[in-house]
Amino acid sequence: MQFVASEHPHRRLNPLNGQWVLVCPHRTQRPWSGQQEKAQKNELPEFDPTNPLCPGVTRPNGIQTPEYESTYVFENDFPALVEVVPVPPNNDDPLFQIAPARGNCRVMCFHPKSNLTLPTMSAAEIVVVIDEWISQFNELSAKYAWVQIFENKGAAMGCSNPHPHCQIWSCSFLPTEPQLKQERLRAYYATNERPMLADYVERELQRQERIVIENRDWLVVVPFWATWPFETMLISRNNNKRINDLTAEQRYNLALTIKELTTKYDNLFQCSFPYSMGWHGAPTGPEHAHASSAHWTLHAIYYPPLLRSASVRKFMVGFELLAMAQRDLTPEQAAQRLREVDGKCHYLEK
């Protein structure tokens, strides 16, 4: 019997964190009778007087959101991290380690209208979002070791407010995922004298089978090691290390790429496609200001939960929680489906 990746179970290594993913393509034929999600409704009003992220509405803490006309950033009313916090006492017990955690949490509204999302915004409006990301990054990266820009879109990914927005959490420490990448990227660079993701981009361009979108500045792929069904990685092709390295032209092409990718997502199942996404780049702050970042390549990751339709999602439970990550649809099959979906015209505009 000859191995066929699209038919037989196998494991794939994620070189960014050293963890393996179990791929079981034969399971795509199994019947499904599990939980189905309610698709997010698209009939949202432009303005909701009860939504605290809308212009002019008073938030639960009594602060009125200003009448903003573009992006709007404010300090999170219920932050996970705060800047002033007592330092924990020293503890030498290896089983009860504790460390300080300082930081800042902000909310950033993409647009004053509640019924828009990134795929239904114009490229020019998305450029404004990117510019604000960079402005916030410039300010916060001077002080903090890690600035995590991320968006949770849709109730299926825990988003409690449908208004188009993201969050920016800044940490005095390097969080777990970036720390793993820092170590793996640095080790690869020490051995190969090349950034891992620069080599990865070259290899994917040669193979073509996992590419979703390709242009001069950006590459979108379903990673070889993807865990989520339609997971994608948006990678800089210009040796950018951090988001504030981007030129005006690269920002505009990024806006076009984000719009095309998220339009493909929405068109795949003709719904407002939920996901969690975020940016990863070289660490920042005084601790990392003078350290080499040659091993890093700026990239974003999209983790969408939907599997078979707008109402069927993947759950990370059982074996995934207790043993290792597992997927059914192969990354190559997912990439082909995303490639074939229209990314230029949103289904609501047809």
Curated annotation (Swiss-Prot):
Coiled coil: none annotated. Its EC number is 2.7.7.12. Binds 1 zinc ion per subunit. PROSITE patterns: GAL_P_UDP_TRANSF_I (PS00117). Pathway: Carbohydrate metabolism; galactose metabolism. GO terms for molecular function: UDP-glucose:hexose-1-phosphate uridylyltransferase activity; zinc ion binding. Zn(2+) binds at C54, H163. InterPro entries: GalP_UDPtransf1, GalP_UDPtransf1_His-AS, GalP_Utransf_C, GalP_Utransf_N, HIT-like_sf. Its cofactor is Zn(2+). One of its GO terms (biological process) is galactose metabolic process. Residues 31-52 are annotated as: Disordered. It catalyses: alpha-D-galactose 1-phosphate + UDP-alpha-D-glucose = alpha-D-glucose 1-phosphate + UDP-alpha-D-galactose. The keyword ATP-binding does not apply. UDP-alpha-D-glucose binds at N76, D77, N152, Q167, K314, F315, M316, V317, F319, E320. The active site is at H165 (tele-ump-histidine intermediate). One of its GO terms (cellular component) is cytosol. Keywords: Carbohydrate metabolism, Galactose metabolism, Metal-binding, Nucleotidyltransferase, Transferase, Zinc. The keyword Phosphoprotein does not apply. Homodimer. Belongs to the galactose-1-phosphate uridylyltransferase type 1 family. This is Probable galactose-1-phosphate uridylyltransferase. It comes from Drosophila melanogaster (Fruit fly). The lineage of its organism: Eukaryota, Metazoa, Ecdysozoa, Arthropoda, Hexapoda.
